[in-house]
């Protein structure tokens, strides 16, 4: 039996210490790769030509109400249901113990009929305090960047595009404060997701839900701008999206 002698390069290699690898500043500087959860999902969406459509959009002039989006893949159909409400500034916190949020939403398998919508309306806004339906794959909540949201909606309502450099300072219109999956609060367990070719990889369902939140945030801010000035309001430029 031939025994391979270690090369000089092999002898010099050694594992880095956890203190080096897990340093928070170092971790925060990592760039996305092909293995990153979001890029892996969006690559699959592009390759398979997933279709996203807005089926209901029941918002008032301030953007409060609900919206339903359909996510159609080659194999399955899913829906994302979003609930938007008024939130006092004193209630807006990113801590996990919060009990109210600007937005709550869910990703679920199949169709949304009137009976299911009634259940979702009563429970999804409550998050962990609600009785969640087992067809839900993901449940989440988010708070807005008040300044960024106001800046974008005001600019669009006046017929202008928001300043990109300013938007980069916040980087978002909404930020999730928790994204739950894998059986949390009674929703579908990961074992169930293994049967779906769309979401069998870890965190892919969660990333799909967050992707749809991003779409809703743009739809909502454009809606608010149109309500403020129907004659001058413009849509957000694709480069800003």
What is the meaning of each model-derived region?
Residues 2-24, 99-241:
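Mixed-charge, Lys/Arg-enriched low-complexity segments
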Residues 25-51:
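Acidic-basic catalytic patches of nuclease active cores, encompassing PD-(D/E)XK
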């Amino acid at each position: 039996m031939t025994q391979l002698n270690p090369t000089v390069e092999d002898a010099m290699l050694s594992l880095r210490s956890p203190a080096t690898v897990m340093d928070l500043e170092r971790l925060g500087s990592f760039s996305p790769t092909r293995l990153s959860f979001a890029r892996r999902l969006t690559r699959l969406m592009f390759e398979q030509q997933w279709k996203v459509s807005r089926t209901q959009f029941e918002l008032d002039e301030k953007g409060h109400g609900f919206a339903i989006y359909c996510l159609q893949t080659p194999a399955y159909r899913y829906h994302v249901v979003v609930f938007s409400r008024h939130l006092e500034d004193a209630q807006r916190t990113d801590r996990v113990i919060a009990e109210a949020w600007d937005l709550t939403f869910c990703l679920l398998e199949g169709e949304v009929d009137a009976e299911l919508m009634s259940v979702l309306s009563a429970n999804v806004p409550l998050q962990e305090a609600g009785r969640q339906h087992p067809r839900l794959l993901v449940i989440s909540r988010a708070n807005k960047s008040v300044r960024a949201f106001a800046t974008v909606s005001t600019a669009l309502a006046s017929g202008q595009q928001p300043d990109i450099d300013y938007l980069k300072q916040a980087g978002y219109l909404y930020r999730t404060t928790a994204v739950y999956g894998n059986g949390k609060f009674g929703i579908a367990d990961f074992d169930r997701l293994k049967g779906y070719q769309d979401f069998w990889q870890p965190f892919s369902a969660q990333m799909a839900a967050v992707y749809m939140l991003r779409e809703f945030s743009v739809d909502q801010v454009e809606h608010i701008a149109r309500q403020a000035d129907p004659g001058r309001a413009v849509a957000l430029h694709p480069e800003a999206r």
